[in-house]
Amino acid sequence: MYAEDKFREIYNREPETSFCPYRVCPLGAHIDHQFGPILGFALDYGVHMAYGVKNNGIVELMSMNFPKRVQFHVASVPETKEGDWGDYLRGATKALSEKYKLTKGLCGVIRGALPSGGISSSAAVTICFMKALAKVNDIELSDSEYIYLAKKAENEYVGVSSGKLDQSCETLCRKDNILYMDSKDDTYRNIPASSNIKPFKIGIFFSGLERNLASSAYNNRVDECKAAAFALYSYAVTDRRGDYELKDGLKFQDMRLRNIPEEIFKEFGVRLPTSWQKRCNHFYSEMHRVEKGVGCWEKGDIVSFGRLINESGMSSIVNYECGSPWLIKLYDILSKLDGVYGTRFSGAGFKGCCMALIDPDKADEIKEIVEREYLKEFPTLKGKYKAYICSTSTGVGKAEGDRF
């Protein structure tokens, strides 16, 4: 049953609709929160919402994916999170209400088309709901507002130290393009697929294990990167201040690895704890992979582009030290298969899924082999492991009407 049908069943009227696509990031993983550049696609799967206005200001929403109906008033959002999926709705309402006057609520049904974990379902839920809440209150949000407010909701209310990657891809992407965005200054461009590029699809291979980003090691990795940046900054200021162009008076909370030239890491990185050195190695090498990836994409060289994705995946394992036995097994299987141009963890990379760029003619064969080999290793996940073949899509901010 779809969200529209469920809404009609519950409320006995026709709904309005809202949609936000999921996203994948082939290159630029784990560096957006350090102000690095990213490359991303929006997918033709996403979060759908059927809703109707409530003039009394009450928000009443049920999910077809998670238990518990969420209910609150737009003027009295709980100050602290409750630890359920409704936190994203509460956070979105709070962020929106700090900028605009909200008088109307809504009732509705929300449904994610794919399992959660690794495709930015949390940002998609946040944006999909925010779009609907803004509409019933006659608020028209710009692309930058979608990105800023959805990020604010996750950072300040839900408690996830995410960057702008998820919200940017889900808002700004265009079909048959790859989004290049520099998280340092928010400049971006959609780069069309070259006429020379081989046909490809985006495979999403779910481990069968969902993850809670806020309670994972994600925030710890962000803090390690910031700590490494602050330490490198301190070493450079103390020992070689005149040799580098560095801003004065940077505070820890404002520190990012993008503030630190790679030359400083090469000179002083040996002083860092081993784990921090690894985080830096991932950041700087991923920056280079993104720039190389742009060149490959513009030339239509998907084979070389795929190799960079594989390298990114390995760096996530070795240097960023994310992953799990399940995701690493999926990565190992996919990276060796004929017809897979490149693969890596998607999202935080602790449970979730792997994404892969694949040859469409070999999609069925790839799905069959991955399922067989993965379930041979983890037989208890039969029925939970899932695979989907997706195409690129247009982000919510660029869409011409709702796609439901």
What do these predicted regions represent?
Residues 1-37, 71-76, 81-197, 336-337, ...:
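Gly/Ser-rich oxyanion-binding loop with an adjacent helix/lid
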Residues 350:
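Glycine-rich phosphate-binding loop
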Residues 42-44, 54, 174:
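A short, compositionally biased micro-patch
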Residues 123-126, 353-358:
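FabD-like malonyl-/acyl-CoA
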Residues 1-27, 48-82, 177-342, 357-404:
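C-terminal nucleotide
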Residues 35-42, 221-222:
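Short Gly/aromatic-enriched secondary-structure transition segments
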